Amino acid sequence: MWTVQNRESLGLLSFPVMVAMVCCAHSSNEPSNMSYVKETVDRLLKGYDIRLRPDFGGPPVDVGMRIDVASIDMVSEVNMDYTLTMYFQQSWKDKRLSYSGIPLNLTLDNRVADQLWVPDTYFLNDKKSFVHGVTVKNRMIRLHPDGTVLYGLRITTTAACMMDLRRYPLDEQNCTLEIESYGYTTDDIEFYWNGGEGAVTGVNKIELPQFSIVDYKMVSKKVEFTTGAYPRLSLSFRLKRNIGYFILQTYMPSTLITILSWVSFWINYDASAARVALGITTVLTMTTISTHLRETLPKIPYVKAIDIYLMGCFVFVFLALLEYAFVNYIFFGKGPQKKGASKQDQSANEKNRLEMNKVQVDAHGNILLSTLEIRNETSGSEVLTGVSDPKATMYSYDSASIQYRKPLSSREGFGRGLDRHGVPGKGRIRRRASQLKVKIPDLTDVNSIDKWSRMFFPITFSLFNVVYWLYYVH
């Protein structure tokens, strides 16, 4: 029993030992050990001249490009640029770096890249770029046995993107990344997208706050300069702006403020303070929205789509304020002459009101009338020459002081006394009617202006919105 258990334990212990012995033997015979790799790398770098391109004097070097887009951090309309973070990989074949005896790829320290020839690639529309350096410089160099070199970088670049903002914010923009050789012409180097359509990855995973990436396109071409023809690769992003932010921040507030300005049509026309305050407030609010929007956009010479909408809202708000100015002009007077005449009438009325309380009595107790008072009590062609009833009680008054809202009882008694003695009262009634006709405006016209405005403004503003959105959306 013990012997069987001992043998089983021995067998279990001997298996790992045998595996370790096999592994050690294999490791000792493995050519890819540290010393052999070190010798291989030293041999490759010994006598290597980074000043000369691969196959110098022969055919051009084919450099393949691959891009893995990590993020598009910002798209700025003010600066006309966008910021892109990517993993940028270049690959080419350098026969001077081929090796044998090691069936493995050699991934070396990033500092080895400073000892090897690399393409003089640059971004044509670059404004500011940098290679990330945390915690070490984000570079990769990998050698293949056939001499293929893979060179990778993690780069953040801010590239120029010229935008057409005529349809802003209902626009689509094309932002490109131009990759070109700075010094080598097509006689020395050629660029191509390594992997065809799969050369660019990660685009579908990108999410932007104000844009959606509709499509992207890769282009390979040659450009001619005075110094020769140079290879160029272009990666173009088609960005469609999301309208949701602008509806909440610009379109909806502007629409509500325009509708708010129409409230004045339902306010009584003699409430000047309320209607003027409402009109001025809405005008200033629209001005503030327009000013804030201009600060977030470049100073461009053409009119944008959002400018047209804001100007339309501003016109409707301003016309609502002018509508009350027109109503006020009709209701309270037709020009400065009317205002001057009303002031003179007011001062004359005050003077005559004071004189109405004065009564002149002769020695017999009769009330006397002055020449002006006699003229005021007669019609155009009829002249009062005397008073038939010396006991009649008369008060001096002026026709200019007739108040149609608060008639004096003493004047009515005096009028009846004159009518009783044969002095006609129809002329006086006609004078009062003519004065009432001049002083009281036609309230029906004022009400009709507000009434028609309540229908005209909403209908025209709705038509403006229909035309605007149909034109710019489709």
Swiss-Prot record:
Potentiated by histamine. GO terms for biological process: cellular response to histamine; central nervous system neuron development; gamma-aminobutyric acid signaling pathway; monoatomic ion transport; ovulation cycle; response to progesterone; response to toxic substance. PROSITE patterns: NEUROTR_ION_CHANNEL. Keywords: Cell membrane, Chloride, Chloride channel, Disulfide bond, Glycoprotein, Ion channel, Ion transport, Ligand-gated ion channel, Membrane, Postsynaptic cell membrane, Receptor, Signal, Synapse, Transmembrane, Transmembrane helix, Transport. Residues 328-451 are cytoplasmic. Residues 26-245 are extracellular. It is found in: Postsynaptic cell membrane; Cell membrane. Heteropentamer, formed by a combination of alpha (GABRA1-6), beta (GABRB1-3), gamma (GABRG1-3), delta (GABRD), epsilon (GABRE), rho (GABRR1-3), pi (GABRP) and theta (GABRQ) chains, each subunit exhibiting distinct physiological and pharmacological properties. Binds UBQLN1. Beta subunit of the heteropentameric ligand-gated chloride channel gated by gamma-aminobutyric acid (GABA), a major inhibitory neurotransmitter in the brain. GABA-gated chloride channels, also named GABA(A) receptors (GABAAR), consist of five subunits arranged around a central pore and contain GABA active binding site(s) located at the alpha and beta subunit interface(s). When activated by GABA, GABAARs selectively allow the flow of chloride anions across the cell membrane down their electrochemical gradient. Belongs to the ligand-gated ion channel (TC 1.A.9) family. Gamma-aminobutyric acid receptor (TC 1.A.9.5) subfamily. GABRB1 sub-subfamily. NCBIfam families: LIC (TIGR00860). This is Gamma-aminobutyric acid receptor subunit beta-1. It comes from Mus musculus (Mouse). The lineage of its organism: Eukaryota, Metazoa, Chordata, Craniata, Vertebrata. The gene is Gabrb1.
